[in-house]
Amino acid sequence: FESMGGNDPDHTCILPFTRLKGGPMDYTPGIFQTKLSYYNSSKPKGQAGTTLVKQLALYVTMPSPLQMAADLPDNYRRFPDAFQFIKDVAVDWSNSWYLEAEPGDYITVARQAKGKQEWYVGAITDEHPRTATIPFSFLPEGRKYIVTVYADGRDADWKDNPQSYDIRRGIVTSK
C-alpha cells in the first residue's frame, strides 16, 4: 500500500507496456486483504485498487524471477483455495503470448512454465469490469489440458467487494 491510498486500478495495466518492456521486474503481488481499515480503523479510505483474483493474475502478467507471497499468513489462511494458486504458479517462463491488450485498460497473457507442459493465463483490467477473450490457439494441437479458472465473482468490485471470487475447472484444447 502506498501512503496516499494505493495505486489506481489501471496502474498494473500500464506497467507491462513501460517497466516490463526490458524484461522481468520486481513486483509484489498476492495481497488478499486490500482495505487498510481491516488493520487500522483510522484509515477508512485507504485500499489497493485491485481484487483478490487480480492479485493472482499479476503473477502471470507481471513476470518476476523472485516472486513472493506479499500478504500476511492469516489472510492466506482465510482463502486457502485462492492461495493454492500462489503455491502452484511458475516463476520462470519459456514462452509468452500476449493474447489481447489495450495499455492502461486491460491485458491478457499466456505463459508456459519453463521446462514443463504447464500453461498459465493471466487477465487483468482497470476499474471497468470486462470479460476476457482467451483463444487457446497457443496450446499444442492434439492435447487436452485441465484448466483451473480463478475469476472475480459476479458481485466482485475492487472498491466494494474485492474478495469475491469463483474457482471452476474444465478441459481445454487448442481449438
Q: In which residue ranges do the predicted regions lie?
A:
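Glycan-recognition surfaces
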Residues: 1-73, 100-101
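Structured core elements
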Residues: 26, 57-62, 109, 120-123, ...
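Acidic/polar loop patches that form or flank catalytic/metal-binding clefts of enzymes
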Residues: 65-79, 95-97, 133
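Generic secondary-structure signature for well-ordered alpha-helical cores
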Residues: 66-67, 91, 126, 175
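Edge strands and adjacent loops of beta-rich recognition modules
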Residues: 82-111
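Beta-strand-rich interaction surfaces with strong enrichment in secreted/lumenal proteins
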Residues: 95-99, 108-110, 119, 168-170, ...
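Carbohydrate-binding surface patches
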Residues: 103-143
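C-terminal beta-sandwich/jelly-roll accessory domains of carbohydrate-active enzymes
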Residues: 126-175
